[in-house]
Amino acid sequence: MDNLKKTPLFDLYKKYNGKIIDFAGWALPVQFESIISEHEAVRNAAGLFDVSHMGEITVKGREAFNFLQNLITNDLSKLKDNQVFYTFMCNYNGGVVDDLLVYKYSDEHFLLVVNAANIEKDYKWMKDNKGVYEVEINNISDEISELAVQGPKAEEILQKLTYTDLSEIKFFYFKDNVKIAGIECLVSRTGYTGEDGFEIYMPNKYAVELWEKIIEVGKEYGLKPAGLGARDTLRFEAGLPLYGNELSEEITPLEAGFEFFVKFDKGNFIGKDALLKQKEEGLKRKIVGFEMIDNGIPRHGYEVRADNQKIGYVTTGYFSPTLKKNIGLALIDSKYAQLGNQIEIVIRNKPLKALIISKNFYKKNYKK
């Protein structure tokens, strides 16, 4: 573990019995108490996550808006000041360089929150595509910590620590310079769990203090510290993609089922031509949800079969703590992708029956 990157909270994990794993070169807790109990805490009360491994990149300057509008698939002209949106950066073949959140301060100032495994790649991609745009791009990931409080009790818990009325921060909006437990933070009503909640950004030196304050106040509400395991089962149930599983340089947003975040009518952007061609010609493969009929837990990489041939592979699979079923997502040949179709998942060399169902396994409980 010595050669892995660590967040400012690393020494605190031991106190909470964190089980540490290597995640994209970071030493991070996969669980504290247990994945299931942490998952259920977020669905029913609240969970506190250390997500300081995520990357933060600022884009500032006279042409920040035009630069980003060309770089991402979503339409920046629809984003208001103090609003956040989800988008993709694509390569010229339409594959996904990364999926990210864009925070807009103004047309000349944006904050991008990117996946930990892609920080250096994204930063290089942005600089390589800067061209003649008058912008300043800074990777500030090493200076910033991020905590996520997620679950139906998230607002109630955080409200105990601030005079700012958190109910005024609407879904996918943010407010800067919010004092939480006396610490100035950027707070957004965003998350990766399918529940209401907040993501809180602050300088590294305050991360431990804020974590402890939130744990202290949250106890009576049933808040638990939560690790990467629950973060993954929660996002998966809510139908949210994980880069490297449902998205990659080889998997386009259209194949992943996220055309909503690709705005073909906004003018030119990197990857547009390839994506438009794919849309017009029809998708050869797509990501589907499935539920196991036979007993077995599907896992990432398992083969999917139909008509005695391989038709794709599982991108994510779990026993769902909320639905109490074995379910998964798979990238398969489009001609087999209809709802209600029966497919086979090869588990321990044995083809087991599964049924294609909607990818939205769990109804999201966002406060809008």
Swiss-Prot record:
UniProt keyword terms in alphabetical order: Aminotransferase, Transferase
InterPro entries per UniProt: GCS_T, GCS_T_bac, GCST_C, GCV_T_N, GcvT/YgfZ/DmdA, GcvT/YgfZ_C, TrmE/GcvT_dom1
GO cellular component, one term: glycine cleavage complex
GO biological process: glycine decarboxylation via glycine cleavage system
Catalytic activity, reaction form: N(6)-[(R)-S(8)-aminomethyldihydrolipoyl]-L-lysyl-[protein] + (6S)-5,6,7,8-tetrahydrofolate = N(6)-[(R)-dihydrolipoyl]-L-lysyl-[protein] + (6R)-5,10-methylene-5,6,7,8-tetrahydrofolate + NH4(+)
Keyword Transferase: yes
Record-listed E.C. numbers: 2.1.2.10
GO molecular function list: aminomethyltransferase activity; transaminase activity
Disulfide cross-links: none
Subunit architecture: The glycine cleavage system is composed of four proteins: P, T, L and H.
Function: The glycine cleavage system catalyzes the degradation of glycine.
Record family assignment: Belongs to the GcvT family.
Name of the protein described by the UniProt record: Aminomethyltransferase
Native source organism of the sequence: Thermoanaerobacter pseudethanolicus (strain ATCC 33223 / 39E)
